[in-house]
Design a protein with these regions (language model features):
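Membrane-interface "cap" regions at the ends of multi-pass membrane proteins
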Residues: 1-51, 65, 69, 96, ...
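Helix-loop-helix junctions that connect adjacent transmembrane segments
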Residues: 10-15, 54, 135-139, 168-297
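Select transmembrane alpha-helical segments in multipass membrane proteins
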Residues: 18-28, 54, 62, 94-110, ...
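Hydrophobic transmembrane alpha-helices that form the core helical bundles
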Residues: 43, 56, 65-148, 153-156, ...
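TM-loop-TM module centered on a large, flexible mid-protein loop between adjacent transmembrane helices
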Residues: 86-94, 129-134, 200-202, 245-312, ...
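Membrane-interface loop-to-helix entry segments
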Residues: 139-194, 205, 223, 246-250, ...
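C-terminal membrane-solvent junction of multi-pass transporters and transport-like membrane proteins
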Residues: 165, 331-341, 377-426, 446-457
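Hydrophobic alpha-helical segments of multi-pass membrane transport proteins
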Residues: 176-180, 319, 368-396, 433-452
Length: 459
């Protein structure tokens, strides 16, 4: 059938294009509406010390929209499995610097993919404590490990089944947030919502740093709008569906987050919300009592598990794309013989994520964002311009609105987020970058690739 053709060649041996528009939007929204908004609200408020920390969600939304347009243009132009791996390779030259950039991206994935999955799993385990007696940190970490393994098992199946499951999980996640919003709308108090401490808006480094920290948490909450780009080889009509899925998912989630935070800060004093470890459950307990808080907690845990599901689904396609291209270990190019999904890549990243479950949640989030900015995000913003100027052979069915303004705004906001994290975390990100460059140069020297030579038949 035309809707289920293989994405590579006509042999039927490649990935299956089994995701339509509905499933594409679902794959993004499910990842974005994970545990993030439920566990990061207190961290967001603490970053600026008051309800004006809502600016973090607004700044995060602006950054997501501008960066989302970068993803939409690149995703529509090069809709193969692997996302950024393909974009960086083609933009910087497939037999020149593109080899280094695409290698660095795959190198980064072996840090950011497990880090991303671990944030959802650790958040799940921490939030689950609302339902029972307090447990030790070690027990919490092992609950997170168990979730990683369970999700890996759940993903060990064909893409059409996963697409339908993603849509169901999206409905659960959206329903959970809508219940919170509707429950609180009639109870919002303006005096709580605008209880902003005196002197909060002073244009000092402290304010800028706090705003950058709030934006970092905000963009973490929006993370996932690019998920469908990593599944580009499995999307039907990708030149249309990928840009639409990116933009629609950001719009849906931005509205939900802004209403969610307005509702919570209008019902709970911001000091109480900042101190809560289960802020949404505490909110529902204020409105309805403990029964509603417990029901909501189960729904939050379901949304969290759904996010981990979507994260691991998207990331597992990246080592596959690199290995199939001959740029990574060939074992990762293997597909399941019957259901045709990258089983080796999936299992490897699923197991690797269990290691990061033993780190602190805040440290995981910061490390994740910084490594992504340094290696992937900045290189990809430049990639849009490089393709427009030097690769007229690449068809661009979707073009960024108002180019180059969105890409420049995204660049400035990402740099603001980067400098607000502090020298230690940025230094660790640069260390990961340096190690990746060193590994690439060693490999390139051994096999005679750029910059030491050209592959046979290369330009």
């Amino acid at each position: 059938m035309p809707n289920e053709q293989a994405s590579e060649g006509d042999s039927g041996a490649g990935l299956i294009r089994g995701l339509g528009l509905k499933e594409a939007v679902s794959a993004n929204v499910v990842e974005m509406l994970g545990i993030g908004p439920f566990i990061t609200i207190p961290i967001l408020i603490a970053s600026m010390g008051g309800p004006h920390a809502m600016l973090g969600w607004l700044l995060g939304a602006a950054l997501a929209i501008c960066d989302g347009l970068v993803w939409a243009e690149l995703g529509a132009a090069m809709p193969g499995a692997g996302g950024s791996y393909v974009y960086l390779r083609e933009a910087y030259g497939p037999n020149k610097m593109g080899r280094l950039m695409s290698f660095l991206f795959v190198w980064m994935i072996f840090f950011t993919a497990p880090l991303s999955v671990a944030t959802g799993a650790v958040g799940f385990a921490q939030y689950a404590q609302y339902l029972g007696p307090e447990i030790s940190p070690l027990a919490t970490q092992f609950i997170a490990v168990g979730l990683c393994l369970l999700i890996t098992f759940a993903l060990y199946r064909g893409i059409r089944t996963i697409g339908r499951l993603s849509f169901i999980l999206m409905l659960i996640a959206i329903g959970t947030i809508l219940w919170v919003i509707v429950s609180g709308l009639g109870n919002i108090r303006a005096d709580l919502l605008f209880d902003i401490p005196e002197g909060s808006f002073s244009w000092s480094w402290s304010f800028v740093s706090g705003l950058g920290g709030a934006a970092l948490i905000g963009i973490y909450g929006y993370g996932g709008y690019n998920n469908i780009c990593f599944l580009g080889g499995e999307v039907r009509n990708p030149s249309r569906n990928i840009p639409f899925a990116v933009i629609a998912s950001i719009a849906i989630v931005a509205l939900l987050y802004i209403f969610l935070n307005t509702t919570i800060l209008g019902v709970m004093p911001w000091q109480d919300a900042m101190a809560s470890q289960h802020v949404v459950s505490d909110f529902m307990e204020i409105i309805y009592g403990s029964w509603a808080a417990q029901v909501l907690t189960y729904l939050v845990l379901g949304a969290s598990a759904a996010s981990v599901f979507a994260l691991l689904l998207g990331y597992s396609r990246i080592p596959y794309a690199a290995a199939k291209d001959g740029r990574f270990f060939s074992v990762f190019a293997k597909l399941h013989p019957r259901k045709r999904f990258p089983n080796v890549s999936l299992v490897t990243l699923g197991l690797a994520s269990t290691v990061f479950c033993f780190f602190e949640l805040g440290d995981i989030i910061q490390a994740l964002i910084v490594i992504q900015i340094i290696i992937q995000v900045l290189g990809q913003i430049v990639a849009v311009t490089l393709i427009r100027k030097y690769r007229p052979d690449i068809r661009r069915p979707f073009q960024m609105w108002g180019y180059p303004v969105p890409s420049l705004v995204a660049l400035i906001l990402w740099l603001l987020v980067l400098v607000s994290t502090g020298a230690t975390i940025v230094g660790l990100g640069l260390l990961v970058l340096a190690c990746g460059i060193g590994l690439y140069m060693l490999r390139a020297r051994l096999v005679g690739e750029w910059p030491f030579g050209q592959p046979i038949g290369g330009p």
